[in-house]
Amino acid sequence: MEGLLKLSTLVIVCMLVTAPMASEAAISCGAVTGSLGQCYNYLTRGGFIPRGCCSGVQRLNSLARTTRDRQQACRCIQGAARALGSRLNAGRAARLPGACRVRISYPISARTNCNTVR
């Protein structure tokens, strides 16, 4: 019986310790790429920026509330950029937040160290 009480106490302590971490779950790459999906043609071919693209950039900015979210969004953006390879115009990607009237604290670049994003 004493062993069961210790086990129950340990389980409760673990739940209390990990609960704050679960509530700070980072944004998913699916949410990032979903938000930026309408930007694809602009980022690869140029032309005008679709209204839906800027809406997605603004939505992503509002979803990335915590440092952890912003770091994860940075990693997801870099992963998507790597997948696009030479089709991605890095200059357009770097200018996109400003063109959509969104201020972010880090440059959109393959060289950005996402661990330093706050």
From Swiss-Prot:
InterPro entries linked: Bifun_inhib/LTP/seed_sf, Bifunc_inhib/LTP/seed_store, Plant_nsLTP
- GO molecular function terms attached to this record: lipid binding
**One CC-aspect GO term:** plasmodesma
> Which Gene3D superfamilies has this protein been placed in?
Plant lipid-transfer and hydrophobic proteins
Which keywords has UniProt assigned to this entry?
A: Disulfide bond, Lipid-binding, Signal, Transport
Q: Which GO terms describe its biological process?
A: lipid transport
Disulfide-bond pairs as recorded:
29-76, 39-53, 54-100, 74-114
Which Pfam family, giving just one, matches this sequence? Tryp_alpha_amyl
Superkingdom of the source species? Eukaryota
Residues of the signal peptide: 1-25
Q: Which CDD domains match?
A: nsLTP1
Q: Which PROSITE patterns has this protein been placed in?
A: PLANT_LTP
What's this protein's function? Plant non-specific lipid-transfer proteins transfer phospholipids as well as galactolipids across membranes. May play a role in wax or cutin deposition in the cell walls of expanding epidermal cells and certain secretory tissues.
- Family (UniProt): Belongs to the plant LTP family.
- Protein name, as recorded: Non-specific lipid-transfer protein 5
Q: From what organism does this protein derive?
A: Arabidopsis thaliana (Mouse-ear cress)
Tell me the classification of the organism that encodes this protein.
Eukaryota, Viridiplantae, Streptophyta, Embryophyta, Tracheophyta
Q: Which gene encodes it?
A: LTP5
